[in-house]
Amino acid sequence: MKKLTEKEIREELNKMKGWSLKGNVIEKTFLFHDFKEAVNFLNKVQPIADSMNHHPDVCIYYNKVIVQLTTHDAGGITDLDVELAKKIDELLT
């Protein structure tokens, strides 16, 4: 696991649609038709996060899911956060 510099983070985010840097986290908001779809999405994220032993912070607001990624042990964003973000995006392609 490698902690990324701000430049490295921005370079990665430029390749990823919808993700942004917010302080010490990368964040993306996902919109769904309703609450059930939002929960189903998180049910798909869970096994991926578990397999990586890396878990996002999430908030659900009816049909909106906000996902935040950071590596607390590293004190910032690492390659693991970027990898998980890409895998989460793949769920919707």
UniProtKB/Swiss-Prot annotation:
Q: Which UniProt keywords apply?
A: Lyase
The record's comment on protein family reads: Belongs to the pterin-4-alpha-carbinolamine dehydratase family.
Q: Which organism is it from?
A: Sulfurisphaera tokodaii (strain DSM 16993 / JCM 10545 / NBRC 100140 / 7)
Q: What GO MF terms are annotated?
A: 4-alpha-hydroxytetrahydrobiopterin dehydratase activity
SUPFAM superfamilies found in the cross-reference section: PCD-like
EC number(s) on record? 4.2.1.96
User: Which protein are we looking at?
Assistant: Putative pterin-4-alpha-carbinolamine dehydratase
Query: CDD domains under this entry?
Result: PCD_DCoH
GO BP term, example: tetrahydrobiopterin biosynthetic process
Supply the InterPro entries for this chain. PCD_sf, Pterin_deHydtase
Gene3D superfamilies this protein is in? Transcriptional coactivator/pterin dehydratase (3.30.1360.20)
Catalytic activity field: (4aS,6R)-4a-hydroxy-L-erythro-5,6,7,8-tetrahydrobiopterin = (6R)-L-erythro-6,7-dihydrobiopterin + H2O
Q: Which NCBIfam families match?
A: PRK00823.1-2
User: Record keywords: Transit peptide included?
Assistant: no
Which top-level group of life is the source organism from? Answer: Archaea
Question: Is the keyword ATP-binding in the record?
Answer: no
Q: Which HAMAP family match?
A: Pterin_4_alpha
